[in-house]
């Protein structure tokens, strides 16, 4: 059974991973990536364009499926840990209409085996509009 994940990262980090075929979450910590398996769905939410900036982007920036997940997290030049992934290769940028600042971090699986939804870093104060 596939799981579905919401990953939170700046748009710049999502773009780098998409271009180079890997994903990164939680400031490069490996533990969350060990839980991601081939076939899992990934949606990236970016509260900012660049890490540390407060530009209020608040957009879903990529969507896709993990292609390679059996290998352990790997080291990347610009990140502590990442996982080879096709999550960004077939994704496209999704934008929202309004903007305000929201916190970052890794979120728990969406629609997991238990069917529960847990989102540790969701910002309920500013709704997002997704264009598909």
Swiss-Prot record:
It holds the Pfam family EVE. NCBIfam families: PRK02268.1-2 (NF002616). It comes from Mesorhizobium japonicum (strain LMG 29417 / CECT 9101 / MAFF 303099) (Mesorhizobium loti (strain MAFF 303099)). Belongs to the UPF0310 family. It comes from the Bacteria. CDD domains: EVE-like. SUPFAM superfamilies: PUA domain-like. InterPro entries: EVE_domain, PUA-like_sf, UPF0310. This is UPF0310 protein msl8638.
């Amino acid at each position: 059974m596939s799981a579905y994940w919401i990953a939170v990262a700046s748009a710049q980090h999502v773009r780098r991973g998409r271009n180079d075929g890997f994903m990164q979450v939680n400031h490069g910590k490996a533990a969350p990536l060990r839980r991601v398996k081939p076939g899992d769905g990934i949606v990236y939410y970016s509260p900012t364009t660049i890490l540390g900036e407060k530009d209020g982007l608040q957009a879903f920036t990529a969507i896709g499926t993990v292609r390679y997940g059996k290998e352990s997290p790997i080291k990347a030049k610009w990140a502590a840990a990442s996982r080879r992934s096709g999550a960004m290769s077939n994704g496209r940028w999704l934008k929202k209409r309004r903007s305000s600042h929201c916190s970052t971090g890794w979120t728990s699986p969406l629609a997991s085996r238990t069917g529960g939804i847990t989102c540790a870093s969701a910002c309920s104060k500013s709704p997002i509009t997704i264009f598909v």
